[in-house]
Amino acid sequence: KKGGQTFDFVNYSLNAATPSEIEQRNRELAAHEAARQSLIRPSREVTIDAARLPLQLISFQDANTTAAEEYNRLAVLLMTTASEQPIKRVLVASAQHGEGRTSVALNLACALSLAQRRVLVAETDLQKPSFLDFLGLSAEVGLTDALAKGISAGSAVVRIQPFGFDVLPTREQVKHPAELLSSPSFGEMLALFDPDYDFILFDSSPLLAVADTSLLVRHADTTVLVIRSGKTTSGQISKAIAPLTPEKILGVVLNRADRIT
């Protein structure tokens, strides 16, 4: 849920459009789809069985549930905001571990991809990576390999089918993540990814746990804050959002799930 947020849906009518306008719109849609097909070069595609995924990944399993609809609403909010101001990189953050940040990031990616947006989810919680276990994947190359060893970042990207979004996982824990996230290589990697995606989501470390999340704030255009009801105090929330300016907070997801990762 996004407290205090309202959602404005834009309806397009073709009734008043001229044939040339309709043709132009069709060309634009075709160009967008061509870009979607040609720009992104994931190293491999993996088809996953949604029925075997954790229950938290509800958008993968049943798009008709109330929870999945909430992710669709969040996706609409993000897309609407991005149409009004330059937003591409989204920090998905929480005050502490166990609030559902990773599941929110992956569910949001699924909802955006189903809305025909090109999405990359980068696992930037380098001290406690969980993408591979969460999605049941294995990887020989990950985000930290690309940064520390000079390996092509694209070689670490995996396309998740049948949902159509990409993930950039981290294979193993990093003792000093700030060194990697503050390196010129990280900024250069993001700059390479920018043209290929409509949205890049950062699944970050908890804001209160480590200092390296503040480094990601510099690279992000906006933030989605995940709070687990009954777990995080108002004082912890205030401290967590201290590095963020109000205009850099898109909204808050109040997570009430019993099982959170």
Where do the model's predicted regions map?
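Pre-Walker A (Motif I) flank of P-loop NTPase domains
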Residues: 86-90, 101
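Hydrophobic positions on the alpha1 helix immediately C-terminal to the Walker A/P-loop
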Residues: 104, 108
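Acidic-aromatic/histidine active-site loop/patch
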Residues: 1-77
